[in-house]
Amino acid sequence: TLSFVPGIEKLVRLIGAPVVTARIQNADRVYPRWAQKVRKGRVHFEFDPPVQFERKTPPEEILAYIRERTTLTPENSRNWPVTGKNLALGLTNIVYACPSCGGLESLVEDKSKIACTACERAWELDTSNQLNSLDGGTSLTVTEAMHKAQARFAQTWLQDTARYEAEGIIMESEPLSLMDQSDVDGVEIATGRLQLTETELRMIDSETQWSLPLSDLRLVSVEMTRKLWLTTQDKVFEPIMPKESVLKWLHAIQHWKAAAES
């Protein structure tokens, strides 16, 4: 379950409309957030009766109800058989560091397997989203592997410590296209590499000069699995990364923007 939008409980109380909560069972197996294709299997929707909250209901009580009725746990989740091929394709977008050695962007996908080019550990993914070790190492769930990747990155929030100390470069991307998605038809505005510093995002190796102060960012988000959106007051920019994890970039930008504002 993803985090709730801040203030949703206050919005419910303000509007005064009945609340219908729902749970989607087995969707995490049929269409995981990293998957490039839907697997074959059953998805089950459960809806609760409408609940009306009074204006005087404490917000924390409303939030507790919504969280309880929409959160799936091992105790209340229902699973059905799922089949599919190439299960690991797209997985390194969310597991962007090796669960064993912590190497950033060191994992390579191969159909339903991932392997680390640094420590040579390997895993095979099954339809229950379990990463099973192929070499006597530790098996773990995708969720556990994702949390390990985030924890590893959060130790420094840097791609290369030495380069950061020498040049102030926090992150530098693979070659990419930068799009302006503010209108219905997106427009390419630059090609090159995206860099992140403590104060800005900027394009290098590009014929077009482009930079965006972190202070101008209103929102950074990942949409539809691999769309990294950089939203300002009047523009939406999207760096289209062919292979690199956009979730890693999301976490980095969020961290350094917050650090700059603190």
Regions found by a protein language model. Give the residues of each.
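Non-catalytic terminal regions of proteins
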Residues: 175-195, 202
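Phosphoinositide-dependent membrane-docking surfaces
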Residues: 194-227
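Short, surface-exposed beta-strand/loop "edge" segments at domain boundaries and coil↔beta transitions
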Residues: 187, 208-211, 234-241
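Non-catalytic C-terminal accessory region of glycerolipid acyltransferases
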Residues: 1-178, 196, 219-224, 228-262
